[in-house]
């Protein structure tokens, strides 16, 4: 027997209906029992509820990226892994020591780092929702928990001046570029 997961339909962002059809067509003449496991949104929703309210220790990188994401989200644009990567890249370019060691690589949509995925995952359940199981496409919206925004603002004010300046410079830089395409071009 063969068990097949929903290939490419998590982080890959592929349409499950098309993928399932391709799998069935490719394996229809196979003389084995085949089990195809479909994506399950109920699991993701249950995990969102379960992880809500967890507390994490704030660090400069967590505080800065969360503040920048709150700012971006408050402009009416959805935050996503794509947005988080671009904001982190800009923070690094603006001199933030908290992001100095992050290694960005050229990717489909500009600079990208898997380290940012882990940073966003750490924030999930406390400051954002939508990244349970580290499973979201680049542009899948992440829900910001705005009721904790004041906490982040207070934390950022405790950071050294260089970090605060890099955050201000990043916010100034993205002003007028509040869309995913504009962020990509800017990066």
Q: Where in this protein do the model-derived segments appear?
A:
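A glycine- and small-aliphatic-rich helix-loop capping segment at beta-alpha/alpha-beta transitions
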Residues: 18-27
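Short, histidine-centered active-site or binding-site loop motifs used for metal coordination
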Residues: 6-8, 69
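Catalytic phosphate/metal-binding cores of nucleic-acid and nucleotide-processing enzymes, i.e., regions
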Residues: 1, 6, 14-17, 30-34
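Short catalytic/ligand-binding loop motif for oxyanion handling, primarily in non-cytosolic enzymes
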Residues: 10-14, 44-45
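Short linear motifs at secondary-structure transitions and domain/linker junctions
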Residues: 8-12, 161-163
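Mid-sequence acidic-hydrophobic segments that form the walls
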Residues: 10, 26-29
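Domain-edge interaction signal
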Residues: 29-33, 39-187
